Swiss-Prot record:
Native source species: Salmonella typhimurium (strain LT2 / SGSC1412 / ATCC 700720)
The keyword Heme belongs to this UniProt entry's keyword annotation: no
GO terms of molecular function: double-stranded DNA endonuclease activity
Keyword Cell membrane applies: no
Name of the protein: Recombination-promoting nuclease pSLT051
Family named by the database record: Belongs to the Rpn/YhgA-like nuclease family.
Gene Ontology terms: biological process: DNA recombination
Job of this protein: A low activity DNA endonuclease probably yielding 3'-hydroxyl ends. Involved in RecA-independent recombination and horizontal gene transfer.
Tree of life domain: Bacteria
Stored NCBIfam families: T_den_put_tspse
Keyword annotations of the record: DNA recombination, Endonuclease, Hydrolase, Magnesium, Nuclease, Plasmid
Record-linked PANTHER family: PTHR34611, RECOMBINATION-PROMOTING NUCLEASE PSLT051
First-tier enzyme category under EC: hydrolase
Length: 313
């Protein structure tokens, strides 16, 4: 829900002057909410919420207020939208559901764990009478029965975690991607070569798609030796061998460069460590030369008795 940043229209200002008053809003809801909805609402808990869901460029046509309240089913909201324009919006039902979902989203972002009930209410003041359109958003579809069935049922789910690998192998052009995404978190993807190679040999994927999959394995997966994995795959799938060998060579080069960098870094760290030790020994030597007792020197420098024994006065 966003803050309003345009100058209020006379419609908007007047509407808000009244409907932002809880007592007036309570009267409005007692008068106009359907009985079955009014029965689930505790109107004594009405609380005005800040902001607006109406887009800035539409404020001359619409105004809205949002109230939170307690319902018999937990937290809830009543969103009142008033239409100022003379010609009614035939997609108003869809607008109402969009704003209701936006209110639900804001509720979740505030840290709540469950979706709230949001009751949209349209306050129509246009010239055309009576209001000519349905406020049931599903009626905006060509096939309302099918839309009702779709949006009131569980959505389709593809849970790859429960599909057997043998079944996945028969999924044609989706097989390789599905298999890899199912096992991407396993300990070592190199164990998948025996299953992956026959799928790639089936010829459903182009070389660019195979390369994309291998990069995905290297970047997102776990394998003890990525280069060896890719070389093995190149031998098993000769039609993509050149492309895969190119990747293997790139991985080999990266490994060499990483080894060089690691060696250089270790050399730097070793040199730094040796330099710090030499400086500490020098400080200890000076302290001993100034007749500071050995226990104090060891405590202040962290050196041991053996370290001090190496110091020549």
């Amino acid at each position: 829900m966003k803050k309003k940043n345009t100058t209020p229209t006379p419609h908007d200002a007047t509407f808000r002057q009244f409907l932002t008053q809880p007592d007036i809003a309570r009267d409005f809801m007692e008068l106009h909410l359907p009985a079955e909805l009014r029965a689930i609402c505790d109107l004594s808990t009405l609380k005005l919420e800040s902001g607006s869901f109406v887009e800035d460029d539409l404020r001359q046509y619409f105004s809205d207020v949002l109230y939170s309240l307690k319902t018999t089913a937990g937290d809830g909201y009543i969103h009142v939208l008033v239409e100022h324009q003379s010609t009614p919006d035939k997609h108003m039902a869809f607008r109402l559901i969009r704003y209701a979902v936006a209110a639900m989203q804001r509720h979740l972002e505030a840290g709540h764990k469950k979706l709230p009930l949001v009751i949209p209410v349209l306050f129509y003041t246009g010239k055309r009478s009576p209001y000519p359109y349905s406020t049931r958003w599903l009626d905006e579809f060509d096939d309302t029965a099918l839309a009702d069935k779709l949006y009131s049922s569980a959505f389709p789910l593809v849970d790859v975690t429960v599909i057997p690998d043998d079944e996945i192998a028969g999924h044609r052009s989706m097989a390789a991607l599905t298999l890899l995404q199912k096992h991407i978190h396993q300990r070592d993807l190199a164990e998948l070569v025996d299953r992956l190679a026959p799928i790639l040999l089936a010829g459903y994927l182009s070389s660019s798609q195979v390369i994309s999959l291998v990069h995905y394995i290297v970047q997102a997966g776990e394998t003890s030796d990525a280069e060896a994995f890719v070389r093995e795959l190149a031998q098993r799938v000769p039609q993509h061998g050149d492309a895969l060998m190119t990747i293997a060579q790139q991985l080999e080069q990266k490994g060499i460069e990483k080894g060089i960098q690691l060696g250089e870094q270790r050399g730097i760290e070793k040199g730094r460590s040796e330099g710090e030790r030499e400086a500490t020994l020098k400080i200890a030597r000076t302290m001993l030369q100034n007749c500071i007792d050995r226990n104090t020197v060891m405590k202040m420098t962290g050196l041991t008795e053996d370290d001090l024994a190496q110091i020549r006065h």
